[in-house]
From Swiss-Prot:
Keywords: Aminoacyl-tRNA synthetase, ATP-binding, Cytoplasm, Ligase, Metal-binding, Nucleotide-binding, Protein biosynthesis, Zinc. This is Glutamate--tRNA ligase. One of its GO terms (biological process) is glutamyl-tRNA aminoacylation. Belongs to the class-I aminoacyl-tRNA synthetase family. Glutamate--tRNA ligase type 1 subfamily. A motif ('KMSKS' region) lies at residues 250-254. A motif ('HIGH' region) lies at residues 9-19. HAMAP family: Glu_tRNA_synth_type1 (MF_00022). Catalyzes the attachment of glutamate to tRNA(Glu) in a two-step reaction: glutamate is first activated by ATP to form Glu-AMP and then transferred to the acceptor end of tRNA(Glu). GO terms for cellular component: cytosol. It comes from Protochlamydia amoebophila (strain UWE25). It is found in: Cytoplasm.
Amino acid sequence: MSVRVRIAPSPTGDPHVGTAYMALFNMIFARHYNGTFILRIEDTDRARSRPEYEENIYSALKWANIQWDEGPDIGGAYGPYRQSERFDIYKQYAEELLSKGKAYKCFCTAAELDEMRELSAKQGGRQGYDRRCRHLTPDEIIEREQAELSYVIRLKVPLNGECVYEDAIKKRMTFPWADIDDQVLLKSDGFPTYHLANVVDDYLMKISHVIRGDEWMSSTPKHILLYESFGWTPPTFLHMPLLLGKDGKKLSKRKNPTSIFFYRDSGYLSEAFINFLTLMGYSMTGDQEIYSLDDIIREFDYKRIGVSGAIFDVQKLDWVNQQYLIKNIPVEQLWDRIKEWSFNDEFMQRLMPLCHSRIKTFGDFMDLFNFLFINHLHYNDAIFVVKDLSKEQICYLIQSLIWRLDELENWNGTGVNQASREIAEIFGVNHKKIVMPILFASLMSKTQGPPLFDSVNLLGKDRTRARLLKAMEYLGGISNKKMASLKKAWQEKSGQPLMIKD
């Protein structure tokens, strides 16, 4: 059997380090076994999927030296490789499940589903759909169809017994069917859910091994049931440990920079980055920690993949990157790599208009723009003295701005400017005297500097967000009680009471 593996990211935001992590191990697995690595785009979320996000996935993975053999951008024998181009296929297979009696039409309205959830929560019973449409008679189904009621197609999950399967990493896994909901497979608008599209695509693309994060383990019984319902042989499942933050919880952008672009723009070597990611979920033989990708591929053994979550430790990444710089980048190549990182012509041409009328001598250049070329700003209390606001109140403004910036569809200086003005209005403070000084301090560690929102364009979304988080950390953050008040104020878009001294 030929080895075929895949990753299937969704183009709904910035490329996550978890995407690179899974892509890396899929690629290593394929290369070690002389197989094929496929990139598939799961773009069925119409509200959030965007072509530019898809392009970002390609750019981020290519920066990390992750290469695929089939995909939307390069084609292949099993395309199309975007789920949005395969809707007719999913509908066909959903209808097949209906005809086999393995699925059923559910006509319940959103209001009825909400009522079910509320009732089960009050009674402390089984959470999820109560399966009322599963027992409709043929005549009742025809009656609802003739009334042109909308419906979804649900998977008919066994009411008792267990799903037992062998995971290549986690070993034998057992899930009672009573704990598994009758999963929606096809929504009322004809769009498939992840579960149907995932299984159909993996089968048609002849995927032999599914290598993914262990957050998908609870969904695997549904996928195995789908394979059995179609009469197909399931692939081998390998569930990888998740990347965790220092707090031991799933890596989250609320506390850590999670975009691949953040690490690229911060000056990490792509070779060191993938070496570091490999160490997160895998142990090489011996005590060496610096390996080339070729070494990892040659010696790879999936049995050495860890079972428990791995801590994404940026200090360890710094160490790995430094070792790569010392051992793998000759002195005569160092300046070329630094220029490639941030002193490249494209970046400097964007910077020069800001610089041209603001320096008296060339010696002023780095003093004015040093914040663009360093990763770790050094804050002090003096730069955060803003009128009579407390440190916690400054954090309210910063956190709310982060939430607002996360909502921006297009990141640019104009959008950030407008977002910051909205925050000033919500909290009833002066934009120029309060919000802008906080941004200068957070993003540049200065009380003033070059044009703020032009500078934000140069910093980019990921580094801007990371610096706002770091500023909050320096200021002491927000207590849990106050965070609850802030969330309420944010939802109501009225933060003035939080800015009034007790």
